[in-house]
Amino acid sequence: MSSLLISYESDFKTTLEQAKASLAEAPSQPLSQRNTTLKHVEQQQDELFDLLDQMDVEVNNSIGDASERATYKAKLREWKKTIQSDIKRPLQSLVDSGDRDRLFGDLNASNIDDDQRQQLLSNHAILQKSGDRLKDASRIANETEGIGSQIMMDLRSQRETLENARQTLFQADSYVDKSIKTLKTMTRRLVANKFISYAIIAVLILLILLVLFSKFK
């Protein structure tokens, strides 16, 4: 494992624990402090997703063993689920419309003027939009991961096809070599047989001449 990957993992774990602790403290905080805490947690959540992306890139670049790479990618998927369950959902539950009354419950409504109320509602709307953007980003990330996995599978399949084709070419080359050797052997035998045939014909002609010579002598 590369030193950069170890550093990313350490930063991820530290940021994750800090975000959990902030979410645990937020419900008991005054409204102004709570809003600040939630914004900070939102930033930490973005950092966590960024770290996962950076770790995924580093895994592809630094881990050559396919089995080890697959194991680490499974760990990244588990961490992504942890962010969803331990950070994103609790954060959303504190900022969505269903929890608005609880978020403002510790304030006396009669003491809040219109400007303050409008500011609170504006902050809530901003958090709501941020939550929607996070949902879209998560959906796009999942789709991208699926496309990337499919591309890797296609590349792996093409590599296997090329390997099989190369083996087939090696076998065909071996067969061609054997065929050439067989043809050379057959050619040598044909030449030898031709010389033998010429020799036999010459001997027969010689015998015929000897017979004729003996008769006319």
From Swiss-Prot:
Gene Ontology molecular function: SNAP receptor activity; SNARE binding
Compartments, record wording:
Prevacuolar compartment membrane; Golgi apparatus membrane
**Sites bearing Phosphoserine, chain numbering:** 110, 149
Summarizing the annotation, the consequence of altering residue 158 to R is: In VTI1-12; blocks constitutively the traffic from the late Golgi to the vacuole and blocks the transport to the cis-Golgi compartment at nonpermissive temperature
- What residue ranges are annotated as transmembrane? 195-215
The alphabetized UniProt keywords are:
Acetylation, Coiled coil, Golgi apparatus, Membrane, Phosphoprotein, Protein transport, Transmembrane, Transmembrane helix, Transport
What is the recorded phenotype of mutating residue 148 to R? Answer: In VTI1-1; exhibits defects in TGN to PVC transport at nonpermissive temperature
Identify the PANTHER family for this entry.
Answer: VESICLE TRANSPORT THROUGH INTERACTION WITH T-SNARES HOMOLOG 1A, VESICLE TRANSPORT V-SNARE PROTEIN VTI1-RELATED
Q: How does it assemble?
A: Forms SNARE complexes with the t-SNAREs VAM3 and VAM7, and the v-SNAREs NYV1 and YKT6 on vacuolar membranes, which are involved in biosynthetic transport pathways to the vacuole and in homotypic vacuole fusion. Forms SNARE complexes with the cis-Golgi t-SNARE SED5 and the v-SNAREs SFT1 and YTK6, which are involved in retrograde traffic to the cis-Golgi compartment. Forms SNARE complexes with the t-SNAREs TLG1 and TLG2, and either the v-SNARE SNC1 or SNC2, which are involved in traffic from early endosomes to the trans-Golgi network (TGN).
User: Would you tell me the protein name for this molecule?
Assistant: t-SNARE VTI1
Its source organism is: Saccharomyces cerevisiae (strain ATCC 204508 / S288c)
Taxonomic classification? Eukaryota, Fungi, Dikarya, Ascomycota, Saccharomycotina
